[in-house]
């Protein structure tokens, strides 16, 4: 039914434990779910072997050594067994409700993107625990993307893990597909972590040279879409038009005022 693909960080220390937990949740979704781990980070091959995921070590990188989004999507296109895809950050725990949401949206539309807020929670002990203890991360924190093959034929060479590429994915889908905010129906648990894997830390990931390059590749601030730009919402298993026009107006004002510092 679904091919999940992700580009993990090295499976070391605390982030390694976080990623093992996320990976286990994906492979637990059943035999109809194919899981692809992309890139040659330390521990990725062993993690894939232990969980039954597939490991694809070859992945193009930026000049600074960061995995590229276009390469990840191309690898998924070449290897995926299912036309329904999910690109997800490697620290996010998923549950069966994601599959339910995908089925319901796919039954009503052939071209779509499903996104939604994740919840910040450490060591979630199941969906209900994540929902009870988690804190919503906001409309701009995008960690999973569910879509049918063919939606992203031309992906720029974004640096994964830097600002702006996730917002562009929403903008691109919005051009000729419906974008569904599934926050009300899907619980996705984002586990807290540091930015030790990025030289310069979180500031570099969001405001550094590769973030600035991502903004350029995206086509500027006007294309930094968030959940406020979704055309539809999924609530109680039913699709509705997104009533959040005032929120979209406020979001455009926020984006216009945003400054991206380059160091």
Please give the residue ranges for each predicted region:
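Active-site-proximal specificity loops/subdomain of glycosyltransferases
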Residues: 37-85
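Short, acidic, metal-binding catalytic loop of nucleotide-sugar glycosyltransferases
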Residues: 20-33
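N-proximal low-complexity "stem/linker" segments adjacent to membrane-targeting elements
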Residues: 1-23
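Short, hydrophobic beta-strand segments that form beta-sheet elements in well-ordered domains
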Residues: 33-40, 114-116
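Short, charged/polar "capping" segments at the starts of alpha-helices
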Residues: 13-15, 41-47, 122-125
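C-terminal catalytic/acceptor-binding lobe
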Residues: 3-8, 159-263
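Short beta-strand-to-loop acidic/aromatic patch adjacent to the donor-nucleotide binding site
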Residues: 82-95
């Amino acid at each position: 039914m679904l091919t999940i693909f992700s580009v993990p960080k090295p499976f070391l220390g605390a982030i390694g434990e976080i990623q093992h937990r996320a990976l286990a949740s994906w492979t637990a979704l059943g035999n109809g779910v194919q899981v692809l781990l992309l890139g040659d980070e330390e521990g990725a091959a062993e993690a894939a072997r232990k969980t039954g995921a597939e490991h694809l070590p070859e992945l193009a990188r930026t000049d600074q050594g960061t995995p590229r989004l276009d390469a990840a999507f191309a690898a998924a296109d070449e290897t995926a067994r299912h036309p329904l895809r999910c690109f997800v950050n490697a620290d996010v725990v998923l549950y069966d409700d994601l599959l339910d949401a995908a089925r319901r949206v796919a039954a009503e539309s052939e071209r779509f993107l499903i996104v939604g807020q994740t919840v910040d929670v450490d060591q979630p002990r199941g969906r209900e625990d994540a929902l009870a203890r988690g804190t919503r991360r906001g409309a701009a924190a995008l960690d999973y993307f569910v879509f049918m093959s063919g939606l992203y034929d031309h992906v720029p060479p974004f640096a994964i893990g830097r600002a702006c590429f996730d917002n562009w994915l929403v903008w691109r889908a919005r051009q000729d597909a419906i974008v569904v905010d599934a926050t009300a129906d899907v619980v996705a648990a984002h586990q807290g972590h540091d930015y030790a894997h990025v030289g310069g830390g979180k500031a570099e990931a969001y405001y550094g040279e590769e973030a600035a390059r991502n903004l350029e590749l995206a086509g500027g601030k006007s294309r930094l879409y968030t959940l406020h730009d979704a055309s539809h919402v999924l609530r109680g298993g039913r699709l509705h038009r997104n009533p959040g026009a005032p929120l979209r107006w406020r979001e455009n004002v926020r984006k216009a005022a945003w400054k991206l510092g380059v160091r």
